[in-house]
Amino acid sequence: MLLAPWWCLLAMVVRCATQRAEPTACDDDACRCDSFTRLICHCTDDYKELTLRPDGAYRIPPTATAIIIDGCDRLIFLPDTVRNLIHLRLVEIRNVSHVVVNERSLAWNPFSRDSETNPGLRILIHNSTVNEISSYAVQGRVDDIVISDSRINVLRPFAFSSLTGVKTIELTNNIFDNIEIQSFKKFTTNNFILRGGRASTLPSRFLSDVEVTNLFRVEGVSIKHLSSLTFLVNLPKRILVESNSIDTLDGDGFHISSRGPITFRNNTVATVRNGAFLGFTADVEVVSLMGRQELLIDNNTITMLSPSSLTYNTTSLLLRLDGLNLNMTCTCQLADEWRGVLSEQGGIINCWYELEGHYVSIPTYLDTRCGAFKNTFWIFVVVGVFVIMVAAAIAIYFILRRENEKKKKLQIVMPDGKTYRETEFHIVVERAELLTTDL
């Protein structure tokens, strides 16, 4: 009987504590938490803006395993939003009109010991407009970063930095308005893929001190200016730069040490600066064990290119030119400029043959248009045509003159001999005088 008051008192304390408990994001009108402790937010017309915070009222609950946001007009991540969410594995953002990712808001490494065996975070952004990804916004233990079909207004320095255990970074069909230097800084990933979309300028050190252990790929991207030292990358097994449209490719734009072959294929480039391929090298250990690696330049169309633009690292690489289309009109002078490259490297280099309206290999053009006689061939043709025209004009002149002389001769019509057998004709030429009024 004495214990009854204590149980009543304890129940009252628990009830009061429950009443005083602050609401979490699960209690937000636009959000809910499911049985898997995932925070799922789908904004409506009444609740268009959402702010995710680490503490205080409507904070993300510490048991959250995923944060899934869809259809909001505006989403803001405050600093340290996910830092202490030890159970978190996924951050997914879809169809959001304005996203702001503040400093350290997606910095996540809740484990006391830094180890790649610890589970990591997966970050997905799809079909959204990201106003800004601040410096140091994404750090720590991250498995994958996938951003697709989105627009990024501002990407600050060190936005993605000091990451561990990264498997894949994939940027697909995005529009980058303003990228600042060293946006991706100092981490290791298995794969880095930049595919589709467009960027006004990829600045120097866009990727800085990044180690890619498997695949480095840039494919189908429209780039106005790819600056010098844009990609500072080490040790990928495979490098593929394919089907891109680049206005200007600066020298040493790809500063990459590879452990395997390098392919630069099906790209359209307006201007290639000197030394554009000089930054490609092969790792010293790989060269010592397997020999020089291949640098394949295959089926590219380039408007402004000089032989010095194809300078490469001969110590660690072997260059293979297979279908380089120079978007320039074929001339014997152009062919002479590339004669040395062809004799040294071999391969197929084409120029635009206007007379026939297609690309033709430089050796073929040399053989057909640039011999000792062929250089003066058109001069002979022009002179021959001129001589023929003059001869024709002279011939026409004499023919017309002869015809005119025939017309001036007197013509007499003789009567039939049967009728006028004894008729004599006397032709008297009289001088005609002017008539006077005396007649």
Language-model features, listed with the residues they occupy:
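Extracellular leucine-rich repeat
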Residues: 2-439
